[in-house]
């Protein structure tokens, strides 16, 4: 009898052990399956992130002059390329120095982001009915925009009457000239204004075909180093606003791009702040200047991207001036320039 009870006990133990083993195997299998499902979901999420935009190429304007430090740092460090490459988007650059060419490229869709466009150009384009919006600021630097001449007798607006003055149209430099002339009740029609890029204007001044060159940044610095006469700079005349612009349509249709662009700009700003010496060297190499020259000019710039009330006032001042000087046909409210979020 005792043996029988012992046999039954052994059987029960074996059964319990077997059940426990089955339960453990089942739990392990379920855990493995859950982990596999999680890995699959994560892989799918990563794939979705990479394909979250239907764009295959994104084109930015690339302008290093007058002293566009964020632009130089961005390309040198490949920040846009990495940011958007992770999304499967190719990054391309359009080297357009004329404000008119930049805004036209945005309107045609050849360029998606104007990465450093003058406030004058933005206002002129918007006033003519184009879809263009300020996403954020790029820089402010009135003292960096200058009028240089070899003729030291050119010290007043009146002394410029009939002179050949060259510089890029639709830009802060264009506004500087018109503003300077306006202080004496003159208009751009009182001078022989020639539309030229900054390098070409400086070359014209060097060669003698131009009386006054509208220059900025490194070119202005070099003109001063050559002993050329500073007729005027933008202090008290212009705000020298430069912005980052897109179309409202692009902003509405591609929020994922806008978000990544803002992150990339933060990365650029962080690099400039955390690595000032390296920043100066990179810019000096790009512009073929010594680092002391870059540091001297850098102090003239405010590269913060936030749009402030002062910036908006600056835009309005520029718009009012453009209307009064006949650059635009009707008074313009700059509040319509900013993104409708």
Regions found by a protein language model. Name each.
Residues 68-74, 94-131, 143-157, 173-175, ...:
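Pocket-flanking alpha-helical
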Residues 253-327:
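Secondary-structure end/capping motifs
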Residues 19-43:
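Bacterial lipoprotein signal-peptidase II cleavage site
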Residues 120, 190-194, 199-283:
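Pocket-lining segment of extracytoplasmic ligand-binding domains
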Residues 73-89, 174-193, 224-225, 281:
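Ligand-binding cleft/hinge of the Venus flytrap
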Residues 52, 58-76, 170:
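Extracytoplasmic "Venus flytrap"
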Residues 58-64, 158-170, 270:
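Short loop->beta-strand "edge-of-pocket" segments that line small-molecule binding or catalytic clefts
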Residues 149-164, 252-256:
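Flexible hinge/capping segments at coil-to-helix
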């Amino acid at each position: 009898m005792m043996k029988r009870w012992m046999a039954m006990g052994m059987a029960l133990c074996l059964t319990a052990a077997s059940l426990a083993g089955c339960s453990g195997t089942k739990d392990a299998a379920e855990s493995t399956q859950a982990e596999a499902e999680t890995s699959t979901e994560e892989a799918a999420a990563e794939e979705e992130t990479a394909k979250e935009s239907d764009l295959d190429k994104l084109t930015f304007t690339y302008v290093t002059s007058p002293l566009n430090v964020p632009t130089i740092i961005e390309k040198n460090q490949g920040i846009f390329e990495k940011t958007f490459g992770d999304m499967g988007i190719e990054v391309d650059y359009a080297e357009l120095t004329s404000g008119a060419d930049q805004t036209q490229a945005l309107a045609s869709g050849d360029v998606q982001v104007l990465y450093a466009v003058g406030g004058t150009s933005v206002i002129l384009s918007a006033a003519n009915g184009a879809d263009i919006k300020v996403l954020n600021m790029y820089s402010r630097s009135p003292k960096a925009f200058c009028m240089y001449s070899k003729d030291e007798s050119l010290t007043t607006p009146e002394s410029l009457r009939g002179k050949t003055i060259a510089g890029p149209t639709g830009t802060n430099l264009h506004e500087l000239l018109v503003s300077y002339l306006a202080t004496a009740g003159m208009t751009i029609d009182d001078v022989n204004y020639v539309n030229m890029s900054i390098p070409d204007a400086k070359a014209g001044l060097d060669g003698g075909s131009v009386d006054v060159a509208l220059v900025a940044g490194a070119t202005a610095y070099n003109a001063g180093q050559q002993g050329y006469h500073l007729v005027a700079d933008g202090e008290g005349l212009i705000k020298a606003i430069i912005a980052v612009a897109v179309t409202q349509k692009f902003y509405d249709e591609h929020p994922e791009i806008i978000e990544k662009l803002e992150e990339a700009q933060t990365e650029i700003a962080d690099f400039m702040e955390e690595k000032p010496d390296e920043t100066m060297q990179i810019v000096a190499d790009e512009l073929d200047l010594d680092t002391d020259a870059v540091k001297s000019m850098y102090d003239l710039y405010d590269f913060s991207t936030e749009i402030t009330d002062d910036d908006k006032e600056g835009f309005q001042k520029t718009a009012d001036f453009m209307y009064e000087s006949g650059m635009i046909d009707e008074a313009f409210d700059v509040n319509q320039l900013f993104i409708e979020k």
